Design a protein with these regions (language model features):
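Catalytic domains of carbohydrate-active enzymes, especially glycoside hydrolases
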Residues: 65-86, 300-304, 375
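Glycine-rich, proline-tolerant flexible connector loops at the mouths of alpha/beta enzymes
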Residues: 85-98
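Aromatic- and Gly/Pro-rich amphipathic surface segment
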Residues: 40-76
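A common structural microfeature
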Residues: 18-20, 63, 80
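Active-site region of glycoside hydrolase catalytic domains
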Residues: 2-50, 74, 93-95, 103-479
Length: 479
């Protein structure tokens, strides 16, 4: 995991002319209308209703408000938008019957994007497997892999004239970890490392099959996958136990998935660590020879990698039992992550954190990008598909002064430019999020957007960060 920092001078202030300045969304977090217009159920519907904490309806009412949001994109210099297609809005049961109203909705949405000169970057799965497939085991069941490939192929054909940039999955690590380690997603399993690894492998196999369907189908455009990646640092760089803890989680979150993406298999050191960690929870990982044949072939056709990065992690050795608590309220200091066999997340003195205990250390993005370039020289291009800062965003006198978010974005963009200076090919940056949205585990009090959303009236108000980003996007400079 070592990175050899190349000599870095002051970064160039200028972004390339073709650099994408984007904003990101996800269907379930913005659309609303989760049980109308023919949409089928997903596991989140009943899961959130049973919790009773918050509802995904109406979220940002993007299903009805998207013309407003895309007009704002054009006004504020945002020339790319990450969207996801809700699988169950197209196939209500995951397979079989098609919902024509859902199909037409995305045609209309993509047309509106192009009307406002905003390029859609489209994800096919963003934590929202249709309920009938989820109940059969989600991606631990290989039938879901085939169903996903059928859904993906339908979308490739249906929207071929409107979508150029495709992503198969959003954040395979987050899907696996929140379902099988932290237990904050539907299913709620905690600290089962073998199932987390199996989920990662099976989703990467589904990605590979979809990439081959895209390539062999002769579709125009480009395709890749979005991985949620965090650089891991040992708290004490001279302590072998801390170094091992950092490497354990690095393999679990980063290296296992990146090997699958760019090698199409798993390097011996990756597989040794993965098998050792899976055994901690009493399980094994099923990796078939035919899986690797498919993955190796697909690895040739990844046009880009989407990197979602908000923070890095500092780890120290931990020998106790599992102790996990998700900070879903913004009460600073309440989050805990101690996993048997891996290690413990800790804060480093002098490094700031958000109210949700997320670390603010933009150098971590630089180290991560350089690591990818060094270990996987066959990568072609990277997009920063999510980066941003959750903030409570007080609305006062018709305005939101979110200077901490501006500072966060600016620092990360400067380190991004440093990575580009040393040869990392980055094609664009998407803020999470375009507008304030529903959060899977935080509801509505954790805001990320450029545009403040009054969830009662659905009125949009540009924040200070939107005006700052507009200047950067239009001048392509960091002053």
């Amino acid at each position: 995991m070592s990175v050899n920092p190349t000599s870095v001078t002051n970064p160039p202030a200028q972004f390339p002319e073709d650099f994408v300045f984007g904003g990101a969304t996800a269907a379930y977090q913005v659309e609303g209308e989760t049980r109308t217009h023919g949409k089928g159920k997903v596991a989140w519907d009943d899961f959130l209703e049973a919790q009773g904490r918050f509802s995904p309806d109406p979220a940002s009412d993007f299903y009805n408000q998207y013309p407003v949001d895309l007009e704002l994109c054009e006004e504020f210099g945002i020339n790319g938008i990450r969207l996801s297609i809700a699988w169950s809005r197209i196939f209500p049961n995951g397979t079989g019957e098609i919902n024509p109203e859902g199909v037409q909705f995305y045609h209309d949405l993509f047309a509106e994007c192009h009307k406002h000169h905003v390029e859609p970057f489209v994800t096919l799965h963003h934590f929202d497997t249709p309920l009938p497939l989820f109940e059969k085991g989600d991606f631990l069941n290989r039938e879901t892999i085939d169903a996903f490939v059928d859904f993906a192929t339908f979308c490739f054909k249906e929207y071929a004239d409107q979508v150029t940039y495709w992503f198969t999955f959003n954040e395979i690590w987050a899907d696996a970890s929140n379902t099988y380690i932290e237990g904050t997603f539907p299913g709620g399993v905690k600290a089962h490392l073998a199932e987390a690894f199996q989920c990662e492998h099976n989703m990467m196999l589904a990605h590979a099959k979809a990439v081959l369907a895209f390539h062999n189908g002769g579709f125009k455009g480009k395709i890749g996958v979005i991985q949620s990646l965090e650089f891991k640092y040992p708290l004490n760089e001279n302590d072998p136990a801390d170094i091992k803890a950092a490497n354990n989680e690095h393999v679990l979150q980063n290296q296992f998935l990146l090997d699958a993406t760019f090698r199409g298999d798993y390097a011996p050191d990756t597989l040794e660590c993965a098998n050792r960690l899976a055994a901690v929870s009493g399980g094994t990982i099923e990796i078939l020879d035919e899986d690797l044949e498919i993955m190796r072939e697909a690895a040739l056709y990844n046009d880009y990698l989407g990197v979602n990065n908000y923070q890095c992690r500092f780890l120290k050795a931990y020998d106790g039992e599992n102790d996990l608590h998700h900070n879903g309220t913004g009460e600073k200091g309440t989050g805990r992550w101690r996993v048997k066999g891996i290690g413990e997340h800790v804060n480093k003195p002098g490094v700031p954190t958000t109210d949700w205990d997320w670390i603010i250390y933009p150098e971590g993005l630089f180290d991560l990008l350089v690591y990818i370039k060094q270990r996987y020289p066959n990568y072609k291009q990277i997009f920063i598909t999510e980066n941003g800062m959750g903030y409570k965003d007080p609305y006062k006198d018709g305005f939101v002064d979110d200077q901490p978010r501006i500072d966060y974005i600016e620092q990360h963009l400067r380190w991004l430019l440093k990575a580009m200076e040393v040869g990392v090919n980055v094609g664009g940056y998407f803020l999470w999020s375009l507008q304030d949205q529903f959060s899977w585990t935080n509801g509505y009090n954790k805001r990320y957007g450029f545009f403040y959303v009054d969830f009662e009236t659905q009125k949009r108000t540009p924040k200070a960060s939107a005006y700052w980003y507009k200047h950067v996007a239009q001048t392509r400079r960091l002053d």
